[in-house]
From Swiss-Prot:
Function in brief: Catalyzes the conversion of N-formimidoyl-L-glutamate to L-glutamate and formamide.
Protein name (Swiss-Prot/TrEMBL): Formimidoylglutamase
Phylogenetic placement of the source organism: Bacteria, Pseudomonadati, Pseudomonadota, Gammaproteobacteria, Vibrionales
Organism: Photobacterium profundum (strain SS9)
Amino acids binding Mn(2+) 2: D189, H191, D286, D288
Cofactor(s) named in the record: Mn(2+)
MF terms in GO: agmatinase activity; formimidoylglutamase activity; manganese ion binding
EC number: 3.5.3.8
Gene assigned in the entry: hutG
Family: Belongs to the arginase family.
Pathway(s) annotated for this protein in UniProt: Amino-acid degradation; L-histidine degradation into L-glutamate; L-glutamate from N-formimidoyl-L-glutamate (hydrolase route): step 1/1
């Protein structure tokens, strides 16, 4: 999207702490704390921790001809998370929501990327609540900007950053090439979300079905490897063309029928190899990977899906992966496609909250 269109559009960015309410147990003192008593607004982030961001947007779902309603997901996930018991060491901050109120998806993704990049520069880990899976392109814009800035700082180059332009490989001041960052994208999802944008593979306007195509295009322009794993696919919801494209791109994928207790060891081995070959990780969970009986509140409910127990086992090596310096490889995790409009008794919100709780407890 041209810069003048970005600047003329309106996207709201607000921090509303009213969702953080719940039960209190004063008789238990500090050991009786719950999330709503511990989460702080981002302007009180005085030390490294976990930054929560929201992406209130389903414009990409609408473009992809899906069921809208994911706009209301971030606040609903916070409400479900608020009453969970606190078992964490790191502080957690709420950085507010990017709200796409006028259908300008490209600006919303750009603004989400800015917030993700800022949080990473402040040395926080990031968890994003969505919103349609178009959020993944916004999240990755933030990861990409952060890593490019790290590269440029190392190379002592002060040229302005432009994510839309091809980056040529340049040596640092000593003439030694800077290693290309290897970002592993791990997507638990019933869909590849590798579609070409409607106006062509090089177009910037996408949908909830195109984010990983857009990420692949970005990686191509930056001369980065595209390391993508998609686990939990519903073969009946992905065309042969998408499987062929995934093969061309070297995607590691598994269908939902392959993610069972009988076969999980093979998948774990492949995933461990994938993780070992990456410097950084980005975990994205589309809640439609779970069975509809577990996650009814999604844009595209799954007739079969993958059990929470299997997903949790596959998440473990992602959450515990460390760099050579002992830091978590995981930079950002996000939860996509929660649709409160179709939820039953907040069941899917509770699932999203439990996943958030698990991620937050493990990544530090």
């Amino acid at each position: 999207m041209p810069n003048n269109q970005l600047s003329n559009a309106t996207i709201s960015n607000t921090i509303n702490m009213s969702a953080w309410q719940g039960r209190t147990d004063p008789e238990d003192g500090e050991l009786g704390m719950r999330w709503h008593q511990k989460v702080l607004p981002a302007d009180q982030a005085n030390e490294e921790g976990i930054m929560l961001l929201g992406f209130a947007c389903d414009a990409g779902v609408a473009r992809n001809k899906g069921r809208t309603g994911a706009y209301g997901a971030p606040i609903a996930i916070r409400r479900a998370l608020a009453n969970l018991a606190w078992h964490h060491q790191e502080p957690v901050y709420d950085g507010g929501d990017i709200s796409c109120d006028d259908g300008n998806l490209e600006l919303a993704q750009h603004r989400l990327g800015e917030d993700v990049c800022l949080a990473l520069r402040q040395k926080h880990k990031v968890i994003v609540f969505g919103g349609g899976h178009e959020m993944a392109w916004g999240t990755f814009q933030g990861i990409g900007a952060y890593l490019l800035q790290k590269q440029e700082a190392t190379e002592s180059i002060k040229a302005p950053l432009n994510l839309s332009e091809e980056k040529t490989a340049e040596p640092n001041v000593k003439g030694t090439a800077i290693p290309t960052p290897r970002v592993g994208i791990i997507n638990f999802d019933a869909h590849f979300d590798l579609r070409n944008p409607p106006s062509g593979p090089q177009a910037s306007a996408g949908s909830s079905g195109t984010p990983f195509h857009q990420i692949a295009r970005f990686c191509e322009l930056q001369h980065w490897p595209f390391n993508y794993a998609c686990l939990g696919l519903n073969r009946g919801s992905n065309t042969q063309a998408l499987y062929e494209k995934a093969d061309r791109l070297g995607v590691l994928y598994r269908d939902d029928t392959e993610l069972t207790h009988r076969t999980i060891e093979q998948t774990q081995a492949a995933l461990n190899t994938f993780i070992a070959e990456c410097d950084y990780l980005y975990l994205t969970i589309d809640l439609d990977v779970f069975p509809a009986c577990v996650a009814p509140g999604v844009s595209a409910p799954a007739a079969r899906g993958v059990s929470l127990e299997i997903i949790e086992q596959l998440m473990e090596p992602i959450l515990t992966a460390k760099t050579e310096q002992g830091d978590s490889k995981l930079l950002v995790a996000d939860l996509a496609e929660y649709n409160p409009r179709f939820d039953i008794d907040n069941q899917t919100a509770r699932l999203a909250a439990r996943l958030t709780w698990t991620i937050a407890r493990a990544i530090r």
